[in-house]
Amino acid sequence: MYKAFLIKYAEIGLKGKNRHIFENALKDQIRFNLNKLGNFEVSREQGRVFVECPDDFDYDETVAALQRVFGITGISPVIVINSTDWEDIKQEVGDYVEKFYGRKPFTFKVEAKRGNKQYPIQSPEICSKMGAYLLDRFPELSVDVHTPQEYITVEVRNKAYVYSNTLKGPGGMPVGTGGKAMLLLSGGIDSPVAGYMISKRGVTIEATYFHAPPYTSERAKQKVVDLAKIISAYTGPIKLHVVNFTDIQLYIYEKCPHEELTIIMRRYMMKIAESIANRSKCLGLITGESIGQVASQTMQSLAATNAVCTMPVYRPLIGMDKQEIIDISERIGTFETSVLPFEDCCTIFVAKHPVTRPILSVIEKNELNLSEKIDELVKTALETREVITVK
């Protein structure tokens, strides 16, 4: 039975003198994800992270938890051989093959990695010796070095490890290594995926949600909390800022041309989100927009929205088709929650014919109709926001 996992990573291994920072962040995230499942030992050795499991661990739960750790590219369940004696290694590898494959015929290739450079047998020799031993012990097997049905890998370090299967990890970079940003989170399909995608690059996220009671219900708010909880399985705890946007929305509806409602409301959402982001020491805003998907996501509309911000706005989905976004949302588990029929404030007061090519100077001129009252409403919205830690 497997008692350990060998964790592989790619990009982290290309780092220079600060590589240990990324490796330690990866170890910390692995520990965090596994902590509630039992007492796992996580260690780092020569370009690998090893996870040693308690006797009563659940294999499927452990794999699922590891597959939610950004930075991991591969997860190999391994048999640990508490010896580097060649005869012991041969015997254990043979027993492994017999236990997991029985006596059925298949083609194989032995691969070897010699992390312990003091070990007297070099990697090519390990491969040839082990292949010969397995052919002698299991005559029904045959070697195919080009297209084998199975790869049998032996790694020799302070101990020896054998494995033949590598499960795919999510890739990316460990959360916390890429700064912090503020996600504009709604109850739709796109923004949760944007949060997932930016976190995959190592960015820690907080989130801002614009609530508009009584036009949006408590169930709509709970839907967003639920989405944040799903994302937090990948990102770690998320601080969710819930902003009451009702009075601002009604005032804009009263004072501004209706075809510009969406753009102007989006501009004020960005202003508020940026203010919260600055207070939280974030380095940018994250949105789930992709070019041309709706009227507020044309290049002209995005430029008009961006114009109110001084910090960078990152849009991880900008060049993706809707189906690509849906596919990711289904894979990460947010889709079924996103399609629940509770309206966001973005879907209320939508104009029949919204402007798709807004002219910034015109938008700014029409915003003058809002006078100083809008600043008071924004201040109140910021001061009365609710902060929820979701995990």
Curated annotation (Swiss-Prot):
SMART domains: THUMP (SM00981). Pathway: Cofactor biosynthesis; thiamine diphosphate biosynthesis. One of its GO terms (molecular function) is tRNA-uracil-4 sulfurtransferase activity. It is an enzyme of class 2 (transferase). InterPro entries: Rossmann-like_a/b/a_fold, ThiI_AANH, ThiI_fer, ThiI_N, THUMP_dom, THUMP_ThiI, tRNA_STrfase, tRNA_sulfurtransferase_ThiI. The keyword Metal-binding does not apply. ATP binds at L184, L185, Y209, F210, R266, G288, Q297. Transmembrane segments: none annotated. Disulfide bonds: none annotated. Its EC number is 2.8.1.4. It is found in: Cytoplasm. It catalyses: [ThiI sulfur-carrier protein]-S-sulfanyl-L-cysteine + a uridine in tRNA + 2 reduced [2Fe-2S]-[ferredoxin] + ATP + H(+) = [ThiI sulfur-carrier protein]-L-cysteine + a 4-thiouridine in tRNA + 2 oxidized [2Fe-2S]-[ferredoxin] + AMP + diphosphate; [ThiS sulfur-carrier protein]-C-terminal Gly-Gly-AMP + S-sulfanyl-L-cysteinyl-[cysteine desulfurase] + AH2 = [ThiS sulfur-carrier protein]-C-terminal-Gly-aminoethanethioate + L-cysteinyl-[cysteine desulfurase] + A + AMP + 2 H(+). GO terms for cellular component: cytosol. Residues 60-167 form the THUMP domain. Pfam families: ThiI (PF02568), ThiI_fer (PF22025), THUMP (PF02926). GO terms for biological process: thiamine biosynthetic process; thiamine diphosphate biosynthetic process; thiazole biosynthetic process; tRNA 4-thiouridine biosynthesis. Coiled coil: none annotated. PANTHER family: TRNA SULFURTRANSFERASE. This is Probable tRNA sulfurtransferase. It comes from Lachnoclostridium phytofermentans (strain ATCC 700394 / DSM 18823 / ISDg).
